[in-house]
């Protein structure tokens, strides 16, 4: 059974790591960031629903009187 030749693994892994690092740096350098990030005001509106104005009670089937 032949032995696995691992003599080129170090060069392969090193060159792959350097290439990925360079590609990532190039990708980040082309990204445009906002110059002055500010929070946008959020407009909240109150919605009135019919059940908000009156009291409601929810009956679960187990709390109903026995028949």
Swiss-Prot record:
Keyword Transmembrane listed: yes
Sequence positions bearing N6-succinyllysine: 54
MF terms in GO: proton transmembrane transporter activity
N6-acetyllysine: modified positions: 54, 57
Keywords for the protein's UniProt record, in alphabetical order: Acetylation, ATP synthesis, CF(0), Hydrogen ion transport, Ion transport, Membrane, Mitochondrion, Transmembrane, Transmembrane helix, Transport
A single GO BP: proton motive force-driven ATP synthesis
Annotated membrane topology: Single-pass membrane protein
InterPro entries attached to this UniProt entry: ATP8_mammal, ATP8_metazoa
One GO CC annotation: proton-transporting ATP synthase complex
Coiled-coil residue windows: none
Subcellular localization: Mitochondrion membrane
Main location: mitochondrion
Residue ranges of the TM segments: 8-24
UniProt-listed Pfam families: ATP-synt_8
Job description of the protein: Mitochondrial membrane ATP synthase (F(1)F(0) ATP synthase or Complex V) produces ATP from ADP in the presence of a proton gradient across the membrane which is generated by electron transport complexes of the respiratory chain. F-type ATPases consist of two structural domains, F(1) - containing the extramembraneous catalytic core and F(0) - containing the membrane proton channel, linked together by a central stalk and a peripheral stalk. During catalysis, ATP synthesis in the catalytic domain of F(1) is coupled via a rotary mechanism of the central stalk subunits to proton translocation.
Subunit structure: F-type ATPases have 2 components, CF(1) - the catalytic core - and CF(0) - the membrane proton channel. Component of an ATP synthase complex composed of ATP5PB, ATP5MC1, ATP5F1E, ATP5PD, ATP5ME, ATP5PF, ATP5MF, MT-ATP6, MT-ATP8, ATP5F1A, ATP5F1B, ATP5F1D, ATP5F1C, ATP5PO, ATP5MG, ATP5MK and ATP5MJ. Interacts with PRICKLE3.
Entry's family note: Belongs to the ATPase protein 8 family.
Protein name per the record: ATP synthase protein 8
Gene coding for it: MT-ATP8
């Amino acid at each position: 059974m032949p032995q696995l030749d691992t003599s080129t693994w170090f060069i392969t892994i090193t060159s792959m790591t350097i290439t990925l690092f360079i590609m990532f740096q190039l990708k980040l350098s082309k990204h445009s960031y906002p110059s002055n990030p500010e929070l946008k005001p959020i407009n909240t509106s109150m919605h009135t629903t019919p059940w908000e104005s009156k009291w409601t009670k929810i009956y679960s089937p187990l709390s109903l009187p026995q028949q």
